[in-house]
A protein has these predicted regions:
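Short glycine/threonine-rich turn/loop motifs
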Residues: 42, 58-87, 156-252, 315-412, ...
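N-terminal secretory signal peptides
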Residues: 48-54
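Axial heme c-ligation environment in periplasmic c-type cytochrome domains
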Residues: 59-62, 82-103, 108-133, 228, ...
Length: 460
C-alpha cells in the first residue's frame, strides 16, 4: 500500500513537471525566420483572438456546458462589441498594410497583457501573452509605422502611435484660390446667407463653437460641427462616415434642408454663372466649366491645405526635447497608458476608425436625454446593428479651440471631455491631477496655419 502511494506521488510529480515543461514549451515565440507579420499572426492565432473578436467566432467545446457556456457567450459578445480583429488578421495573412488603429490596439493589448484573459489561457495552453511575444509585436508595430508614415521620426520616437504633421500638400494653387472663394461664398445656400465658413470659420478653429450649427432661416442642426482643419487626414468625413472624400463632403451641406437648403446644384450653378470672375476661373481650370463636380473639387483642393503643422508636440516628436514641459510629457504618457492612443492615432490623433460611444459604461443612458437620429452614428448609413452608436473618431489637433466636444456637443471643456471619455470608454476614473496633465498635453496639439499659431476669435 505504501509503495502504491509512493508511485502515485511520483507519477503526479512527473505529470506536473511534464505539464509545466510542455506549458513552457508552448509559450515560445514563433520562429524568427518567419516574416514579421507572419509571427504576429501566429501569436494572435495562438492567443485565440478570433474566438471572441469576430462576427464568426470559433466557439470552444465548453461553450455548451451550463453556466460556463453563458460566461463564454458573454465574453464573445463583449469581445466582438469592442473590436473585430478578423479584417486585421486577414490583412496579416495577405501581407497587406493594416489600419494604424489595428496596429495600435494589437500592440497595446500585448504590451499590457490584457488578452487573452486568464480564464482562457488556463484552458488553452500556449495562448498566454508573454514578454517575448509582446516584444515581437512591439518590434512589428514600430517597423510598420516607419514604413506606413513618411514623417522623419527616428530613434526612440520612431514607433509612436501618434505622428507629426508634415505639411507639404501637392495642390494646384489656382484651384486652392478658387476653393477658398467658394468656401466663403454664401451663394451656395438658398437665401445667400450661409457659407461653409459660417460653421467652419478659419478664424475660429474650423468650427463655430456652438453645440449645434445654425443653418438658413435660423434652423438648427442636430450634430456638433467637426473642424475642417486637418480633415484631409480623416479616412472618411462626417461623424457617420457618409462621405468618403472631402469633395463628397463638400457636396452635402449645400443641399441639406437645414444647413444651406439649396434645391439642387443647378440652382447654385445658375447663381455662380452670373459672376464673371467665377466663369473665367472655372473655364481656365476645368474644360467643362462650372459643374457640381468642379465646385466640390475646388473646395476639396482648398481644404487639403487646411493643415496645422509645427505644434509644440510635433516639435517634441521630431526631436526637440525642450518643446514640452515635464507635465506635458506626463500627460502624453497618461494619454497612452489609458488607451487613448489606440483610437486617437496618426497625424490627426483620430479620424482613422469608427468606435463605439460608451464602450465600458452606458453613455447614452447616463446622458439621460432622448435619443436622436444622430446618436445612431454609423448605423444611419449601414443599418447594421453593431454600428449603432459608433462614430468616426474625431481628430484632436487644435482641440483647445474646438469646443464644445463629442458628437452631441455636451461637454463644454476639455477637462469634462477627458474625464468622461476615460469613464465611458475605459471604465477608468481619472484623478484631477491626471486630467490636468492630459489636458496640458492636449493643448500642445495646437499647430500653425500659414506660418502663424492657430488662434480663435471666439473666447470660451
Amino acid at each position: 500500500m505504501k509503495k502504491t502511494v509512493q508511485y502515485l506521488i511520483v507519477a503526479a510529480l512527473l505529470l506536473l513537471v511534464g505539464g509545466f515543461i510542455t506549458y513552457r514549451a508552448m509559450l515560445t515565440v514563433p520562429s524568427a525566420e518567419l516574416a514579421p507579420e507572419a509571427r504576429v499572426l501566429a501569436i494572435l492565432e495562438e492567443g485565440g483572438c478570433i474566438s471572441c473578436h469576430s462576427a464568426n467566432p470559433k466557439v470552444p467545446f465548453y461553450a455548451h456546458i451550463p453556466v460556463a457556456g453563458d460566461m463564454v457567450m458573454k465574453d464573445i459578445e463583449d469581445g466582438y462589441r469592442a473590436y473585430d480583429i478578423e479584417p486585421a488578421m486577414a490583412k496579416l495573412k495577405e501581407g497587406a498594410m493594416l489600419n494604424p488603429v489595428d496596429v495600435a490596439k494589437i500592440e497595446k493589448v500585448a504590451q499590457d497583457k490584457r488578452m487573452p484573459m486568464a480564464k482562457y489561457y488556463l484552458v488553452h495552453w500556449g495562448s498566454q501573452m508573454t514578454d517575448a511575444k509582446a516584444a515581437v509585436i512591439a518590434a512589428w508595430a514600430r517597423d510598420y509605422r516607419m514604413a506606413y508614415y513618411h514623417d522623419g521620426l527616428s530613434g526612440e520616437r520612431a514607433g509612436e502611435p501618434v505622428r507629426p504633421i508634415i505639411a507639404n500638400p501637392d495642390v494646384d494653387q489656382r484651384k486652392v484660390a478658387l476653393g477658398y472663394s467658394l468656401y466663403h461664398d454664401t451663394r451656395l445656400s438658398v437665401d445667400n446667407t450661409v457659407s461653409c465658413a459660417s460653421c467652419h470659420g478659419l478664424n475660429t478653429g474650423g468650427v463655430d463653437n456652438l453645440k449645434y450649427s445654425k443653418g438658413v432661416a435660423g434652423n438648427m442642426g442636430g450634430v456638433n460641427a467637426p473642424t475642417t482643419y486637418n480633415a484631409v487626414y480623416n479616412f472618411v468625413q462626417f461623424w457617420d462616415g457618409r462621405a468618403k472624400t472631402l469633395a463628397e463632403q463638400a457636396a452635402g451641406p449645400p443641399l441639406n434642408p437645414v444647413e444651406m437648403a439649396s434645391t439642387s446644384f443647378d440652382e447654385i450653378i445658375a447663381k455662380l454663372a452670373g459672376d464673371k470672375h467665377y466663369v473665367a476661373e472655372f473655364s481656365a481650370l476645368y474644360a467643362d466649366g462650372i459643374t457640381e463636380a468642379n465646385i466640390t473639387n475646388a473646395i476639396e483642393e482648398f481644404e487639403r491645405t487646411l493643415v496645422t503643422p509645427n505644434s509644440k508636440f510635433d516639435q517634441w516628436l521630431l526631436g526637440n526635447n525642450e518643446a514640452l514641459s515635464a507635465d506635458e510629457v506626463l500627460g502624453y504618457e497618461l494619454f497612452k497608458a489609458n488607451n487613448c492612443a489606440t483610437c486617437h492615432v496618426g497625424a490627426n490623433l483620430g479620424g482613422e476608425s469608427y468606435e463605439l460611444m460608451g464602450l465600458r459604461q452606458h453613455y447614452f443612458e447616463a446622458r439621460g436625454t432622448e435619443l436622436t437620429e444622430e446618436d445612431n452614428g454609423r448605423y444611419k448609413q449601414t443599418q447594421v446593428e453593431r454600428d449603432r452608436h459608433r462614430f468616426k473618431v474625431p481628430g484632436l489637433r487644435n482641440i483647445e479651440l474646438t469646443w464644445p466636444y463629442y458628437h452631441d456637443g455636451t461637454r463644454a471643456t476639455m477637462e469634462e471631455a477627458v474625464r468622461d471619455m476615460a469613464l465611458y470608454q475605459c471604465d477608468v476614473v481619472l484623478t484631477d491631477a491626471e486630467v490636468a496633465s492630459i489636458v496640458a498635453f492636449l493643448r500642445t496639439l495646437t499647430g500653425e496655419y500659414q506660418g502663424q499659431k492657430l488662434t480663435s476669435d471666439n473666447k470660451q
